[in-house]
A protein has these predicted regions:
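Structural core segment of the AMP-binding/adenylate-forming
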Residues: 60-61, 88-162
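Conserved pre-ATP/AMP-binding loop-to-beta segment of ANL
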Residues: 30, 142, 155-156, 165-186, ...
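Conserved structural elements of the adenylate-forming
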Residues: 48-53, 164-167, 197-222, 226, ...
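Gly/Ser/Thr-rich phosphate-binding loop
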Residues: 250, 275-280, 289-358, 371, ...
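Conserved AMP-binding A3 loop
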Residues: 43-45, 182-209
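Conserved beta-loop-beta connector loops within the AMP-binding
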Residues: 365, 369-391
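Conserved AMP-binding/adenylate-forming core of the ANL superfamily
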Residues: 10, 32-76, 80-84, 101-106, ...
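Conserved AMP-binding/adenylation subdomain of ANL enzymes
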Residues: 205-229, 237-276, 291
Length: 391
């Protein structure tokens, strides 16, 4: 609390930093659970200890404020730990896309220039094939699920759980400048090589607040609260999993992370943990609804945000028929996790099925704290943008 002391007659200049999201999680919901597949269960308090240990371990490896730490992993509690530990140290977390080709992945690693690279063992061979892209990487830390030392591929490798075990849990996170970079993402599906986009602490906190307002301020069936059980199906390397892991921590939702998955294993997690909130691409929702094992599952308590591509009216109708409360959101790498959202708020859920799907499949309205305009070919934002084509 010493960093909150201030002179009489002055106000505390509250920094919008990820540390403040983290402290809310541990202060209000210390006993809430975070579940990783069938392998690990942590309370928020225990996860906080692991976050402290990760920061201490990275510091011991030489990571300082201003450095970059990269991560290549499936959705996991370890990814979540890096979301907090790395930026709270004053470093930048580069979330790297393992679905890219060798040349593109190598470009992102080379461009990010991480001092330490955290890599799931499934992707270690892929990463090593990027060759010179690793020239500036001082430490390659292997993430693995198995704790059997006999299965380790090399005695000289550094392992994630080992460095956490050796690190103290009393690492102290100081208040830092809210305008320093906290995260580095890379575009996918664009022309040429992936482009890097960085976000500051302030921007990420504001995005989290925008999500909170979008999913908590309206009379809607798409609300996100501490009663929810959240499992993201979008990859965490993409816009921090659309920002929802941060929001889940702030509202105190139970969190479930799938690791490497197929549709059958996802359905098992949905069933066993009674998932009530998720975010996914349209293809994932389609695969879930079409899988034979989903026919016997009750989705009536499930809320799903579909993003990454436009949801079709057919898919939206199929989700509604199964009892899923579905919404769609749009974003872009440069604009953060949420630009607009379309869900059945207010009295919109009382219309016909066709009207409902039409609303869900629309571009929606700009999220709180977001401004949207239509720019013409000269790059000028048009005042009559409601009827003017552009981008």
């Amino acid at each position: 609390m010493n960093d909150m002391l201030y002179a009489t007659g002055t106000s505390y200049e509250y920094p919008l930093i990820i540390k403040k999201l983290f402290s809310s999680m541990t202060r209000y919901f210390p006993s809430q659970k975070i579940i990783y597949r069938d392998r690990a269960v942590f309370t928020y308090s225990e996860l906080a200890q692991r976050v402290n240990r990760l920061a201490g371990a990275l510091s011991a490896l030489g990571v300082q404020s201003g450095d970059v730490v990269g991560i290549i992993d499936y959705n996991s509690h370890r990814f979540l730990e890096s979301f907090f530990a790395v930026p709270m140290m004053g470093a930048t977390l580069a979330t790297l896309n393992w679905r890219l080709g060798i040349d593109e992945l190598g470009h992102t690693i080379s461009h990010a220039s991480p001092r330490v690279l955290l890599v799931n063992e499934d992707f270690s061979g892929l990463v090593r094939r990027t060759g010179n892209a690793l020239d500036k990487v001082e430490h390659l830390v292997i993430i693995r699920d198995s704790d059997d030392p006999a299965e380790r591929p090399g005695a000289d490798a550094i392992y994630y759980e080992d460095i956490l075990d050796m690190a103290p849990q009393d690492y102290t996170f100081a208040d830092i400048d809210e305008n320093i970079p906290a995260a580095l993402y890379y575009t996918a599906g664009t022309t040429g090589l992936p482009k890097g986009v960085s976000f500051t602490h302030r921007q990420i906190v504001l995005q989290t607040l925008s999500l909170a307002l979008s999913l908590g301020s309206y009379s809607s069936k798409i609300r996100f609260t501490s009663k929810d059980v959240f499992m993201p199906l979008v990859p965490m390397w993409n816009e921090h999993g659309w920002g929802l892991p941060f929001l889940a921590a702030v509202v105190g939702a139970r969190q479930v992370y799938s690791g490497k998955y197929d549709t059958e294993s996802l359905l098992d997690l949905f069933s066993r943990h009674k998932i009530t909130f998720s975010v996914c691409y349209p293809t994932a929702l389609h695969l879930i609804l079409e899988h034979p094992l989903s026919k016997d599952l009750d989705f009536s308590s499930c809320k799903v945000i579909v993003t990454g591509a436009r949801i079709t009216e057919k898919l939206a109708a199929a989700a509604l028929e199964r009892g899923i409360n579905v919404a769609s959101s749009f974003c872009m790498a440069e604009g953060g996790a949420l630009v607009s959202m379309s869900h059945l708020k207010g009295g919109l859920d009382r219309g016909t099925a066709k009207k409902k799907t039409g609303i869900i499949c629309s571009a929606g309205l700009p999220a709180p704290l977001v401004e949207v305009g239509i720019a013409d070919s000269a790059g000028q934002v048009r005042k009559d943008s409601d009827s003017t084509p552009g981008e």
